[in-house]
């Protein structure tokens, strides 16, 4: 399995292709929909389901130190969650068919530092406060679906 995944770690685009394929298979019965980033970006969401799952993926551009990897992942999560909870972006989400978000998945090939879990919890609380309880969980997936 590791060898299979390894071929998709060469770029963020390859990682995104793999993640989208996995989400399409896993959530096809829940109406999974990919969001292309070509026109005005994807707003911090790679795809979503009709059941309220949205996800964003991240693949490091190079071999970072543990601290650098944490910083890049933290910054990516912060940036994407900020878009996700922006009042300006709310009409875009609704226009895409995203009504009630129940879960936000951050899919990464690896993480080496518990601080990213602590940061995810901080962001979860931030989203809950903003959305007044409509997002139930923020989940970090490592190596796609553990």
Listing of model-derived features with the role each one plays in the protein:
Residues 1-100:
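Short, surface-exposed loop/strand segments
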């Amino acid at each position: 399995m590791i060898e299979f995944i390894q071929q998709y770690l060469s770029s963020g685009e390859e990682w995104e292709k793999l993640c989208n394929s996995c989400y399409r298979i896993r959530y096809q019965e829940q109406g999974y929909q990919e969001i292309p980033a070509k026109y005005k970006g994807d707003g911090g969401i790679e795809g979503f389901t009709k059941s309220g799952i949205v996800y964003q993926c991240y693949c490091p551009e190079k071999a970072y130190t543990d601290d650098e990897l944490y910083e890049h992942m933290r910054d990516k999560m912060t940036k994407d969650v900020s878009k996700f909870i922006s009042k300006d972006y709310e009409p875009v989400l609704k226009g895409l068919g995203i009504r009630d978000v129940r879960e936000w998945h951050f899919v990464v090939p690896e993480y080496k530092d518990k601080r990213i879990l602590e940061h995810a919890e901080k962001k979860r609380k931030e989203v809950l406060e903003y959305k007044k309880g409509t997002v139930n969980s923020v989940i970090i997936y490592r190596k796609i679906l553990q």
